[in-house]
């Protein structure tokens, strides 16, 4: 896309793409590139503003990512967020302290300069999300303080050069007025024009798929989740019958998943090939407890299945995946300055060498954008708003070794949770809900008998984009009913817990 863009220089923050998402939400094209992109390339880009992302690094580290000072001479407005502000301070001769108080989570900010365009139309105090270990000790010459918290300098600016810094994260949904701050930077400071729409970008993606694939065929692993279904219909729109959807029964699926996925064949006129590989997957996972190893094994087994299919049809050249932005972000490795959270099956679980070329048409979109694309493609509510299900399936919701017994137990427990969510009209009010089976047994009493069985954990979260999430405050009466049903109806579980962890610091899935 050649439209003028807001450029996000990524220093390795898990939220870099989220910054881009927030700005795209207000209608402006946004591009994310690595911080080490040569200045010559940046000069050749059509950009109206630059945002410096956060980073897990400290500016004091010898290997800390840095920036070419010449970028500030391009006469383009710059906004540094968290680490981005700290690198500005360091480069301009200020002082960043690594011994000051760390701040993580909610904090109250107070405006010192209410006339700044960055905080235009905002109250003089509000709640924001902090996530930093270092903080500003001394502001550089020609900069001024715009805002503060009880513990640190929260914002600075050099109005003459249009350089701004925020110690907090306006891009996360729990920062009050974060969207307005980004709007102020984009429209009032950068003078950017509205030039982005999901519909227009959708047409571009279809054209790109046609151009890339040509007359070749594409296979796609259909999981029944929103991402893979949207991906399938998008590719079908581009290449029609040259898309072959493959439903691999891994034996790690939700209860009755086979039936639901095969129904998609008739609902959306998809060419679906069914393969039962459950025995093979379970045998390969025997005695494996490490979550990363489980993901890698499952990824390799999927590719093996797909590559065998290509032997039957030499015209198949591409493997399509419903990889989305958050998958890519969480799978970034440390060599790109981002702390790796976990490898996603879609991006980190595939072997380095495979004969198929990878096609990922959704890897620049966030979850809410995927849903909007699905609406545009005519996907029904019950398919579009199904709760996400990971590629490795129940293998990463069974903590520790995967066995057939544990799969059966978890399928039944998870199905009870889903049933009760529908019965109580709660399913569509929650973005993701599932049960985790722990490798922990505890003593219980059922009737007059002593039991020693597994512990199940219910996990329910609400989120807009799956980059941050809050645990869902469900009614006690509902939790009591679900717990009672699981313990009484599922042989093998005698204790049920409820996970009240938010993201961050926890991830949504346990593995």
Curated annotation (Swiss-Prot):
It is an enzyme of class 6 (ligase). Residues 5-195 form the Glutamine amidotransferase type-1 domain. The keyword Nucleotide-binding applies. One of its GO terms (cellular component) is cytosol. Gene3D superfamilies: 3.30.300.10, 3.40.50.880, HUPs. Keywords: ATP-binding, Glutamine amidotransferase, GMP biosynthesis, Ligase, Nucleotide-binding, Plasmid, Purine biosynthesis. One of its GO terms (molecular function) is ATP binding. Pathway: Purine metabolism; GMP biosynthesis; GMP from XMP (L-Gln route): step 1/1. It catalyses: XMP + L-glutamine + ATP + H2O = GMP + L-glutamate + AMP + diphosphate + 2 H(+). Its EC number is 6.3.5.2. ATP binds at residues 223-229. The active site is at residues 82, 169, 171. InterPro entries: Class_I_gatase-like, GATASE, GMP_synth_C, GMP_synth_GATase, GMP_synthase, GMPS_ATP_PPase_dom, NAD/GMP_synthase, Rossmann-like_a/b/a_fold. Residues 196-386 form the GMPS ATP-PPase domain. Catalyzes the synthesis of GMP from XMP. Homodimer. PANTHER family: GMP SYNTHASE [GLUTAMINE-HYDROLYZING], GMP SYNTHASE-RELATED. HAMAP family: GMP_synthase. This is GMP synthase [glutamine-hydrolyzing]. The lineage of its organism: Bacteria, Pseudomonadati, Spirochaetota, Spirochaetia, Spirochaetales.
């Amino acid at each position: 896309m050649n439209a003028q863009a807001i450029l996000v220089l990524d220093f390795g923050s898990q939220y870099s793409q989220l910054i881009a998402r927030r700005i795209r939400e207000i209608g402006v094209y946004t591009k994310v590139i690595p911080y080490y992109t040569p200045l010559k390339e940046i000069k050749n880009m059509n950009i109206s503003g630059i945002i410096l992302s956060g980073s897990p690094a400290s500016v004091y580290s010898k290997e800390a990512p840095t920036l070419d000072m010449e970028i500030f001479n391009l006469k383009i407005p710059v906004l540094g967020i968290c680490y981005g502000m700290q690198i500005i301070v360091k480069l301009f001769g200020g002082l960043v302290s690594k011994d000051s108080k760390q701040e993580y989570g909610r904090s109250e900010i107070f405006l010192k300069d209410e006339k700044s365009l960055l905080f235009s139309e905002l109250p003089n105090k509000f709640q924001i999300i902090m996530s930093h270990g270092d903080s500003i000790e001394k502001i550089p010459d020609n900069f001024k303080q715009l805002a503060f918290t009880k513990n640190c300098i929260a914002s600075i600016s050099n109005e003459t050069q249009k350089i701004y810094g925020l110690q907090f994260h306006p891009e996360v949904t729990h920062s009050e007025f974060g969207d307005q701050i980004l709007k102020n930077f984009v429209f009032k400071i950068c003078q950017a024009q509205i030039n982005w729409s999901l519909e227009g970008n959708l047409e571009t993606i279809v054209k790109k798929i046609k151009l890339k694939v040509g007359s070749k065929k594409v296979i796609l692993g259909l999981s029944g989740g929103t991402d893979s279904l949207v991906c399938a219909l998008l590719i079908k729109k581009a290449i029609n019958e040259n898309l072959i959807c493959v439903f691999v029964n891994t034996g790690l699926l939700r209860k009755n998943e086979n039936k639901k996925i095969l129904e998609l064949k008739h609902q959306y006129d998809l060419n679906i090939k069914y393969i039962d590989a459950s025995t093979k997957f379970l045998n390969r996972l025997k005695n494996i407890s490490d979550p990363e190893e489980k993901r890698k094994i499952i990824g390799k087994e999927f590719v093996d299945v797909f590559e065998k299919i290509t032997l039957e049809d030499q015209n198949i050249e591409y493997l399509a995946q419903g990889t989305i932005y958050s998958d890519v972000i969480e799978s970034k490795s440390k060599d790109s300055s981002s702390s790796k959270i976990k490898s996603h099956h879609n991006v980190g679980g595939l072997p380095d060498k495979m004969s198929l070329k990878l096609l990922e048409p959704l890897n620049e979109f966030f979850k809410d954008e995927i849903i909007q694309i699905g609406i545009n493609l005519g996907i029904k509510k019950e398919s579009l708003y199904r709760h996400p299900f990971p590629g490795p399936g129940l293998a990463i919701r069974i903590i520790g070794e995967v066995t057939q017994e544990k799969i059966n137990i978890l399928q039944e427990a998870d199905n009870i949770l889903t049933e009760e969510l529908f019965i109580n009209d709660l399913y569509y009010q929650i973005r993701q809900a599932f049960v985790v089976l722990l490798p922990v047994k505890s003593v219980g009493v059922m009737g007059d008998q002593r039991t020693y069985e597994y512990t199940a954990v219910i996990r329910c979260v609400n989120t807009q984009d799956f980059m941050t999430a809050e645990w869902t405050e469900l009614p006690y009466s509902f939790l009591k009913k679900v717990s009672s049903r699981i313990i009484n109806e599922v042989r093998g579980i005698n204790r049920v817990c409820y996970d009240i962890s938010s993201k961050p610091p926890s991830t949504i899935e346990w593995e």
